[in-house]
Amino acid sequence: ATKKEENVQDIAQTVNAVSGSTLDDYQIRDLSELAQVVSGVEFTKIDPRRATIIMRGQKLDPDGGNDQPIQGYIDEVPLRAQDVFSQMYDTERVEILKGSQGTLQGVVSTAGAIQIYTRSAQVGSGEKNGYVKTMWADNMTSMVEAASDLHLSDTLSLRVAGLRNTSDGNEIRNIRTHVNESHNFDSGRISLSWQPSDELSVRFKYQNSETDSIYPQPVAGSNGTPSYEQVVNGYVAEIALYESLGFAPAGSAAQLAYLNRPTYGDIPAGGLKASDGVALHFQNPRQNNSAEIHNLMIDYDMGSHALALRFSDSQNDAMGLIDRDYAGAYVYGYPQEVRTNTGIETFEMRISNQDSDKLEYTIGFFSRNSQTFTTADLDRSFSITEVAPQLYKPAVGFDYKTPNQACNAARAAPGSMAAKSWVLTC
């Protein structure tokens, strides 16, 4: 929190520090699971696209257009919420800093900051500090994590770490596209440490990661009374009448009948329950995040003062596709795709005195240059709106609902096989 080694009890601010061993003991893989060991902070992963953090009554919301009150970091690099919420591995510790943060943390954040520190290569030690860790659980969940140090010389060491995680989530089935829920995360990290003297330490880290999730949106309910087919039949007859009178384009009734009449013959007579985990839409909601992080850290002990320099460059490409037609009322669905490309470059310099126990001070400079480009594609394709815009809303107003959280909660009951892990160290 203060950018130097101190006892948490000696720091004049609210700090929760979670060690890597605690993360391993509780099998904590991402921020949404940190609530097991940290109080006063709420982590919520709404879906693969959105995640929020609430700290001291203020919320970090990636969809918000304003400056965020909570900033997340990995190895002192400020990142977007999607990157911070990615799965943690080979982690040294996590610090939760509550309250306004400024000079010492880089980006000004009014509610707090979250610092994730990964393990660095150890110089001057012959130990590999390596391990291979595997885990299996319900719903086709598997994880393989490995890391090890490679000692190149007495002053130069390299650490390599990687993770692969796959899961079928809550096993939601899309009976229209026959594509079921799946989540995949792959990441690799290289850490290079050079320590030519006791006074100078140089560390460089590169991380590449990709998250890919297909998450059908389950629905619950029935065809309603009247059924959707009866409603569409009525619209077809009405459009045919308008067409015969010249008030609608030729072929409108046929287009409506073809494009907007799913049979729903594959739905049980009693409808769908939340616990069924069934989706009906014709597109496959998908979230894909790919990120690269370059980070250079230089620390120099000048005797009475300590100099710290930080350079970072991070790139993120996020693609989100959703189908707004959850109930499958349109043959081609109602897809909406949003792609966001973000590049962030930062430079930070800090000079701290270390020659006085009575007066401590830090002089810092922080610069951030970020660019974000967002493109959105909203495609109704061949929909009813082309022939009868006024009928769009009532056409999907039957009794199917989209209690996504309720459906997922109903499917997320404790499984018969809890997570089983194996660890091999060297």
Roles of regions detected by a PLM:
Residues 34-36, 46-48, 65, 141, ...:
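Short, surface-exposed loop/turn motifs at beta-strand boundaries within globular domains
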Residues 96-97, 128-131, 171-176, 275-282, ...:
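Extracytoplasmic loops and strand-loop junctions of Gram-negative outer membrane beta-barrel proteins
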Residues 1-123:
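Acidic, small-polar-rich N-terminal luminal/periplasmic segments of exported/outer-membrane proteins
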Residues 174-180, 204, 354-426:
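Signature of Gram-negative outer-membrane beta-barrel scaffolds
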Residues 60, 107, 126, 159, ...:
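Short acidic-glycine motifs
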Residues 2, 58, 133-139, 163-165, ...:
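Outer-membrane beta-barrel pore domains and translocons
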Residues 177, 183-362, 368-370, 404, ...:
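Outer-membrane beta-barrel domain signature, strongest for Gram-negative TonB-dependent receptors
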Residues 68-69, 89-92, 98, 103-173, ...:
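Outer-membrane beta-barrel translocator/receptor signature
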